[in-house]
Amino acid sequence: MSELIQNVKTSFEQVLGYAPSHIIQAPGRVNLIGEHTDYNDGFVLPCAINYQTVVAAAKREDNIVRVVSVDYGNAVDEFDITQAITFQQDKMWANYIRGVVKCLLARGYSFTGADISVSGNVPQGAGLSSSAALEVVIGQTFKVLFNLEISQAEIALNGQQAENEFVGCNCGIMDQMISAEGRENHAMLLDCRSLETESVSMPEEMAVVIINSNKKRGLVDSEYNTRRQQCEEAARIFGVKALRDVTIEQFNEKVAELDEMVAKRARHVITENDRTVEAAQALRAHDMKRMGELMAESHASMRDDFEITVKEIDTLVEIVKEVIGDQGGVRMTGGGFGGCIVALVPPALVDDVKATVAAKYQAATGLKESIYVCQAKDGAGLVEVL
């Protein structure tokens, strides 16, 4: 993070002509288990990771917000918070920031503008929530600069609202919530219906290894929408608000009445919810053998019932599983059809995992992986007052 801090300080001083007063950060995240459960009102178990978005900031008194994006060649966006805050077609990065500010104002928070320089190292397009980290760090920045009475949960909800309503991208609450509320060496069990969270301690030093298959993700949006509709149809047939409300026993009684495809989709969600709650217990007990079994079952369910994995992802999972055995766990993470796998790996095996993947993955698939070795880290907050 020190390089990011240096970059935002330098760009702030060069472009805006004076020194910032505060450094704030918000992390990306990875979901350990609980896939496609969020929009079914279910459970997820993410952790925040040590890739983050960092801001250098200072308050203004004239209702102007000026933002410098280090990652877009020090491009600048400027707007007046007393005027209508509008969507910028030609500056997509700026819309996340404008949306967060607009939603904060609509929620009744008062502040008088800010100068902000922002940079991040959360890999974009890998499904590690670079957009949520940006939304949360901007909310956190206004909280810090103006001592706003806003909870971390509301910073998360505000970021989600900005993405849904201003940017126009439909997302659940998980990404923002873990970025805002994460804890070092802990995962977070999140109930996507009540938004209650529970910190789940992880074995210290356990590496969270994220491997991007670099398989270009096709069909994601259309397939995602189809899965969502199938889940909603299953919930209707069961007469419940969401699949969260169906037990596996109820499912088994009624499975014959369901269309085969809908049944497979529903079975994934129902069993995945149970697995996620049990995984939190296993992780808390530092029972990595059980955690590994649950992650393996989750992957098989995504592959066979939800049908969202691809050959490259299945290959990566198999390669990693060979190395870690029952000392950790591995599964696809994220929306599917490419993207990443996540593995919980004892530190002593991290180099073996990297070497084995390097030796076998490209030979099997023709693609070169990207590996990120992470730890579970704290959520958003103030880094330093300058």
From Swiss-Prot:
Residues involved in Mg(2+) binding: 131, 163
Tagged with keyword GTP-binding: no
Amino acids binding ATP: 69, 125-131
Protein name: Galactokinase
Binding site for substrate: 35-38, 224
EC id: 2.7.1.6
PROSITE patterns attached to this UniProt entry: GALACTOKINASE, GHMP_KINASES_ATP
Species of provenance: Vibrio vulnificus (strain CMCP6)
Function: Catalyzes the transfer of the gamma-phosphate of ATP to D-galactose to form alpha-D-galactose-1-phosphate (Gal-1-P).
Signal peptide residue numbers: none
Compartments reported by the entry: Cytoplasm
GO BP terms, alphabetized: galactose metabolic process
